[in-house]
Amino acid sequence: MLYYLYEHFHINIFHYITFRAILAFFLSFFITIFIMPKFISWAKAKATQPIFELAPDNHKTKNSTPTMGGLIYITSAVISILITTEFNKYVLLTLLLLVYFTYLGFIDDYGKIKGSSNKAGLSAKTKFLLQWVGALVISYLLIKVGFDTKLYVPFYKYPIFDMGYYAVIFWAFIIVAMSNAVNLTDGLDGLATVPSIFSLFTLGILLYIVGNYKFSSYLFYPFELGVGELTIIVFALIGALLGFLWYNANPAEVFMGDSGSLPLGAVIGFLAIVAKSELLLIFIAFVFIMETVSVILQVGSYKTRGKRVFKMAPIHHHFEMLGWKENKITIRFWIMALITNLIAILSIKIR
């Protein structure tokens, strides 16, 4: 909306991505800050979080905490995005992805609330299938709008090969994997929120580079016209997440629920694809990947050997079972996320 003020009235400041990104940050932050208390008051009576029966004992006290807070911060971010961005093909695809995965998460959350059980809601198979459907459609549309299908690796400036239409499957895998990875990480107060902010900030830098001809040429990144607008989406999400963290910090007044974690992970995966940094996710999303790998190892070991690798998975529960306090686990995971994202940022120049 603001970009079109520049086009029609020549208000030059609205032309700059940096200005609109900062504005998007503040808009989504304050919308979330002001709306969330009203949502929490309503959700205390209508939408509390059912706690998994096998969760550590200290989680039982969280049974009355409202969930679906993700609906508020995603809505705040979308409002901010609609106000501050130029609607190009990448912006529209990102919005479509956000809306689809938020709706999918909402259906799952709603089922759990109505069923009064963490096992209610969508079945794992149904949710997984619907995630793949959405991810495949978005990935296919990304190719149809002419996006480059070459694959790049960290610390190397040239593409290793062109994936062609196989990119649809690879990109869909990235989106689904990240969606579930953030969902698995969202088990402690603030645990998924801050690493998501770090990941988004790193992706914001990468997207700005890929969308800027001078910077992309200097740093040997492929140039993609229009990708720079996604930097604004990144800052809208960061602002919304910081507003959410105000209420999600320990002791949490609200949880993001699948309504927040599924779209958040999906958009991190999608933005990494558009930033030509899919494989750099090993650093950008290290904490999320670590949590996911811990679950894969636990399930695989139990099914093949009848033994568990960890006391409980995802791995943050393992540390809880060892007697670590929730805040200590959360802050240490935040530190890991910060360090690995700094490595990812360093890789921009070391290529």
UniProtKB/Swiss-Prot annotation:
Looking at the keywords, is Transport present?
no
Disulphide bridges: none
* Membership in a protein family: Belongs to the glycosyltransferase 4 family. MraY subfamily.
List the HAMAP family hit by this protein, alphabetically.
MraY
The name on file for this protein is Phospho-N-acetylmuramoyl-pentapeptide-transferase
Free-text function comment from the UniProt entry: Catalyzes the initial step of the lipid cycle reactions in the biosynthesis of the cell wall peptidoglycan: transfers peptidoglycan precursor phospho-MurNAc-pentapeptide from UDP-MurNAc-pentapeptide onto the lipid carrier undecaprenyl phosphate, yielding undecaprenyl-pyrophosphoryl-MurNAc-pentapeptide, known as lipid I.
Is Cell membrane given among the entry's keywords? Answer: yes
Main localization (coarse) = membrane
- One example GO MF annotation: phospho-N-acetylmuramoyl-pentapeptide-transferase activity
Pathway in which this enzyme or protein is active: Cell wall biogenesis; peptidoglycan biosynthesis
**InterPro entries tied to this protein:** Glycosyl_transferase_4, PNAcMuramoyl-5peptid_Trfase, PNAcMuramoyl-5peptid_Trfase_CS
- EC numbers listed for it are 2.7.8.13
**Encoding gene per record:** mraY
One GO location term (cellular component): plasma membrane
Pfam families, from UniProt? Glycos_transf_4
The protein's UniProt keywords, in alphabetical order, are: Cell cycle, Cell division, Cell inner membrane, Cell membrane, Cell shape, Cell wall biogenesis/degradation, Magnesium, Membrane, Metal-binding, Peptidoglycan synthesis, Transferase, Transmembrane, Transmembrane helix
Compartments where located? Cell inner membrane
Q: Which residues cross the membrane?
A: 22-42, 65-85, 87-107, 128-148, 158-178, 190-210, 225-245, 254-274, 279-299, 328-348
Membrane topology summary: Multi-pass membrane protein
